[in-house]
């Protein structure tokens, strides 16, 4: 089904560049099952569960001339083996070697001509462990209730639920002309929404002179701060390149729960 990206999802999609990829990475380190976990078994598991996240078989199609936000369309050339990949460390691989591998994988941008996600099965990790690393674009999983592929393949019980056989038939590509006509129709029916879609959201938010003055004041304050160069000294205050480093910080889940209860918020709000 052809659906238009929301304003926030379209923003994540458009803001991406090689130095600032807009995806979310998830690393799972697991004990290897007694029966093992082959690449073929992982492929089968992912294929079984894709119906729960149908967006993962869709790609983004931009509208010519930028008349409207991009749309999600079925990827008629969807290839599960492109998205689910296999890698290995020189056995027995250490955690440091795993972190170096993840840093290299994290530096690679997602291919915008395909569904915006990847999964890597990493073998050879010491202490009889394996790792799963997934990359999912923010446009795919934006929102608290959205599901990512890494969550869908993880079961809460030892015995996974039964999944009905999935026979997926991709829809026909809508084509450039149809998308343009649909965009023109949206302009006629909802001109305000389309203005917001092409970059006039700020004008829509400023509804009176008081808001305009306040917005201008904030912009000037930010400009003065930048001009004075008052950012604190930190290794993070540097030009961002496409290269990445991966490191680990350990924290107690009980501490997260305490903060969440104290301030009545979810963990993602303050992390």
From Swiss-Prot:
GO terms for molecular function: diacylglycerol O-acyltransferase activity; O-acyltransferase activity. Induction: A possible member of the dormancy regulon. Induced in response to reduced oxygen tension (hypoxia), it is not induced by nitric oxide exposure. The keyword Lipid metabolism applies. It comes from the Bacteria. GO terms for biological process: biological process involved in interaction with host; glycerol metabolic process; glycerolipid biosynthetic process; response to hypoxia; response to nitric oxide; triglyceride biosynthetic process. Keywords: Acyltransferase, Glycerol metabolism, Lipid biosynthesis, Lipid metabolism, Transferase. Coiled coil: none annotated. It catalyses: an acyl-CoA + a 1,2-diacyl-sn-glycerol = a triacyl-sn-glycerol + CoA; di-(9Z)-octadecenoylglycerol + (9Z)-octadecenoyl-CoA = 1,2,3-tri-(9Z-octadecenoyl)-glycerol + CoA. It is an enzyme of class 2 (transferase). One of its GO terms (cellular component) is plasma membrane. The keyword Cell membrane does not apply. Catalyzes the terminal and only committed step in triacylglycerol synthesis by using diacylglycerol and fatty acyl CoA as substrates. Required for storage lipid synthesis. Upon expression in E.coli functions as a triacylglycerol synthase, making triacylglycerol (TG) from diolein and long-chain fatty acyl-CoA. Has no wax synthase activity to produce wax esters. Belongs to the long-chain O-acyltransferase family. This is Probable diacyglycerol O-acyltransferase tgs3. It comes from Mycobacterium tuberculosis (strain ATCC 25618 / H37Rv).
